[in-house]
Amino acid sequence: MMNSPRSLDSSDGSVDSSSVYSGTSSFGSSFTSSTGSGFTNSMLFDDEEAKKKKIRQMQNRQSAAQYRERKKEYLEKLETIVDNLESDRNQLLQQTKQLGMLQNENYLKINQLEEQIESALRENNDLKSRLSDLLSKQQPHDNSNSNSNSNNNSNVSPNNSINILNNNNSSSSNNNNNNSNSNNGGIGSFSNILNNNINNNISSSSPSTPSCSSPSFLEGRHFSHLQQQQQQQPQQQNSPQILQSPIPLQHSPLPIQQISPSSPNQNINRRSRFNIGESRERSILNPISIENVNNNNNNNIKLNGSGDMDTSSDNNSSMNINSINNSSNLNGFNGLSSPNQQPNSPSNRSQPKRQRDLFLQQQQQQQHSDPSSPNISSNNLLLLNNPNGGINSNNNSNSNNSNNSNNSNNIINNNNTSYTPPLASFTSILSIASSPSSSPVISSLAQLSSSPNYNSGGFSSFIDSNNNNSNNNNSGLENNSPSRRYKFHNGGINNISSGNLNSLKGIPK
C-alpha cells in the first residue's frame, strides 16, 4: 500500500487498477484477522470468568460447610446445656418433692409431740390432784402426831428439866474428885470437865426430845442454879439489889472511873504476884452476850464477828436467857456501880458470906466425891452473879416472884466489843467468875493462858476488889485509882485492877 501513491505520482494522476485491487484485498484480510483475534480474546475472558465463578462457588461451598459444622457444634453445645438444665430441673423437682415429704413428716411429728405434751400435762395434773389428796389425808395424822409430840415435849418443862439435871448432879456429886483442895486442879482438866457436863446434859434430856450434836452446856447449869436459887430465896429476899450501869468495852485501854467497894475482905496486902490463899472477891466483865439459851439440848451455839454468842434453838420453850442489851442494868459486878450510887454504899458490897460458904461447900462436895471423873459444878458456868449470890432470874415454879411473863432470865450486860474469844477460854472464865476467891480454879489461870484451846490475846481481864490504899497507878484510869498489873507468858490475863476493868489488851509481854 505504500507503493500506490508513488504509482499515482508517477503516472501523473492516472489510477492504476492493479494497485487498487491489491489494496482492497489487503484490507479484507486484515479485517478478518482482527475479528478472529477478538473472538479468541472473548473466549479467553469468558473462561477466566467461569473459573472465577467456579472458585467463588467452591469458596461458598466451603464456607457453607464450615458454617454447617459450626452450627452443628453450637447446636450440640446448646443441646448439652439444655440437657443439663433439664437434669437440674429434674433434681430440683425431686428435692422439692423430698422437702414436701419431710415437711409432712415434721408436721406429723409435731402433732405427735403436742399430743404427748398434752398427755404429760394431764398426767401432771392427775399427780398433783393425787398429791393434794394424800396431803389432805395426811394432815390429820400429822396434826395428831404434832399434838402428841407437843404433849411429850410439854412434859419436859423447865421445872422437870431442873429436877432431872439436879438428880443427875446429885448422883454425880458422889462421883466427883477432890480437886478443890489441890492447887493445880481446876483448869488443867477443864476440857474433860466440859465434856462430862455436856454428856450429863445429853443423858438428862427426854427421849422424845431430839438431841443435837452440840448441846448448850449453859442450860443445865442455869436450871440447876435456878433450883438452888429457889432454895436460897427465903434467905436472900431481904438483901439489897445492885443496879449498875453498863460500861462500853474496847480493845484499847479506856479511862474508866474506878469505884472500890468497901468490903471487909479487901484490906489484904498482896505479898506475891499471884497469891492463891487470899480471900478476896473476883468478878469478870464478860463481853459476850448469850441470846435465847433454851431449856432443850437442841441449841446451836455460834460466835459471830461482833463478840456475841448466838444460840438458835429448834424447839420453842418457856425458859430463855435473853440477850444482853445496852439499855439495861448490869447485875453481879461488885466493882462497877451506877452513877447514882456511892462508892462505899451497902448495896455495892460483895456477896454475903453465907452464900459463898454454901457455894464453896457444894463445889467441894462435888469435886471430892470421885477423883476418876472430874466434873464441874453446875453453878460454875453461870455468867453473872447478883449481890444475892446467884444469877438474877425468875424461875418457873409456883412462887410469886416472877417478873417476866414468859419465865425468861434477864442477863444484862453492855456489849460493844468486836472480839470473839474461843469457847474453851470463855467457859473457863465463866467458871472462874462464879467460883469463890479461894477456889483452886484461880490458881490455874496461868495454865489456861498456855492451853492449846486458848487463843492468845483473848478477853481475860479480872476486876479485882482491891484496897483503895494501894499506891500503884495505871495510865488508863482518870482518877489515878490504884491497881496492880499481872502478866503471863502467853497473854492470858491482861490486868487485875481494884474494882474496875482497866484495859483490854491483846498479848501483854
UniProtKB/Swiss-Prot annotation:
Renumbered residue ranges of the record's region Disordered: 1-42, 134-185, 223-275, 290-414, 465-509
Ranges of biased composition (kind: Low complexity): 10-39, 226-248, 255-269, 292-350, 361-414, 465-483, 490-509
Subcellular location per the Swiss-Prot or TrEMBL entry: Nucleus
Region of interest: Basic motif: 51-77
Keywords for the protein's UniProt record, in alphabetical order: DNA-binding, Nucleus, Transcription, Transcription regulation
CDD domains: bZIP
UniProt region (Leucine-zipper), positions on chain: 78-99
GO CC entries: nucleus
InterPro entries: bZIP, bZIP_sf
SMART domains in UniProt: BRLZ (SM00338)
Superkingdom, natural source: Eukaryota
GO MF term (any one): DNA binding
Domain bZIP: 50-113
Functional summary from the UniProt entry: Probable transcriptional regulator.
Family as reported in the entry's similarity comment: Belongs to the bZIP family.
Protein name: Probable basic-leucine zipper transcription factor H
